[in-house]
């Protein structure tokens, strides 16, 4: 779902006709997993990837050939052969991918606007699609909406609560996936050494929020990829800002008292990642004997021997992604 938010913005920025292609099932191994999507807009713009470049053109040709007749269709691609004439293009992906292509109707576009509103408010949405039909449903914590009045809600909710998502049920031809809010990185400190971190985080799919008390530092010219800039002292910012459980925060103000104030406050919040820039000795003094939560990381970043702002940015973003995916580094 890493590029879903970009596709959603591209879909809703105008009324241009579009087709959404989504991998609903992978048998064996493949370049992308189930849930990966690609948006094809009528004027030729494409957002996202379904593979390493093996199937995208064929998907485009198929949906172009169907034209206005396309509503919803399932396309299988056998990537197992290493023959250059096959879909594997010699890559030996060793898997079969099933791609669902659907034309986005005006009704569904309006429902996607509701989806975006939910995501922007920090709430996840579960998407349910009846393959090879025009039926779909979106589930939220407050209810559901869509064009499927007789949807088997109990069966769907049972699947959502018991199975790992995304999930494709071949018996019912339903594809269910959970759409998470765009992960946010709140970066405390707008020093020039934090610019590479903000840029890399934005490039890898994070909504970046930079906050600093110095107006000369907290500017769009220094942080062009930041979604939000907050110029305020830590006490004011922390009292007014709404944090979400999927947020990651990196504290790098280089100001001892400010860092201590921020860290003490963040420890009381339900965040998935808190990182502190600085040496182990400085961190020990900042904590003043407090026992940090398990999602606190300092020195911040994976231990890759990073030097300089650019390499440190790589290590920090990699560590945040690792915690989100819950993958151990061997």
From Swiss-Prot:
Induction or repression: Expression is very low in excess nitrogen (glutamate plus ammonia) and is induced during limiting-nitrogen conditions (glutamate). Expression decreases when allantoin is added during limiting-nitrogen conditions.
EC top class named in words: oxidoreductase
Annotated metabolic or biological route of this protein: Purine metabolism; hypoxanthine degradation; urate from hypoxanthine: step 1/2; Purine metabolism; hypoxanthine degradation; urate from hypoxanthine: step 2/2
Catalytic function, reaction form: xanthine + NAD(+) + H2O = urate + NADH + H(+); hypoxanthine + NAD(+) + H2O = xanthine + NADH + H(+)
One Gene Ontology term of the molecular function aspect: xanthine dehydrogenase activity
GO biological process: hypoxanthine catabolic process
Keywords assigned: NAD, Oxidoreductase, Purine metabolism
Record InterPro entries: MoCofactor_Util/Proc, XdhC_CoxI, XdhC_Rossmann_dom
Coiled coil (UniProt feature): none
Subunit structure: Could be composed of four subunits: PucA, PucC, PucD and PucE.
Protein name: Probable xanthine dehydrogenase subunit A
Native source species: Bacillus subtilis (strain 168)
High-level lineage: Bacteria, Bacillati, Bacillota, Bacilli, Bacillales
Gene responsible for this protein: pucA
